[in-house]
């Protein structure tokens, strides 16, 4: 009997010691561990970053022509419904989406991040979108504007109009509009900080270098599968194809270098936010890949 009592006391002492030395796993701890397991199992490493995908933002339709207001973190995009109707949308940092109500048909957006101005391209001209959600007509009244981009200093705007996709140059605070012969037609206009203009024509990507009059085909990009060009906050120029292959573009040499892949198919648009996180638009969703400069799983043990 005494022996059994001694064994029971020893068992209780050992159990108490183990319990004190091993912290209790709470539900929150288990959730964090599960989240870390998923993050580290799906981590992607290229372009000097480690990328992990957040929970997708579900939408109904196909996002297009995505752009980001770096100051507020708002993501602007064109939503194409299953009935092929277009509307302009804003995805707020809170995760809520909002339809931008504008006269006529909203077709695309661009952000002048230097001056914190958001421009809306519609079938009845170009509007400015204000922080309070209100809009005002800016220029090109009566023009069916499909695409729009703004120079780095905000003084020059380029627009592509329907149905010819004719490109116009707008200056003098929206008061002067001229045709722009170097680009007879173009989709997805984008301009970098050195005023090089990127665009697509007949499913091929081109760059028109600043102060030149003849566009050059960008070498190293696949034909017919590109989703667009985006200039990051750090002035790097990127392109992505429909299979989420990311490319770095050298405007001076009109060439592209393949960087890596996000393992996503059916890409229709992409963008980068102010922290170089990558946003990818696919049918019924916007995916966000967080960018880490250091490996967040360097001390991870399965």
Where are these regions (language model features)?
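Conserved beta-propeller blade signature
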Residues: 74-77, 117-120, 156-159, 196-199, ...
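Blade-level signature of beta-propeller repeat domains, shared across WD40, Kelch, NHL, RCC1
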Residues: 264-302
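Repeated scaffold domains used in trafficking and secretory/extracellular systems
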Residues: 61-67, 104-113, 143-151, 184-192, ...
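Short loop/turn segments that connect beta-strands within beta-propeller blades
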Residues: 91-95, 129-134, 170-175, 209-213, ...
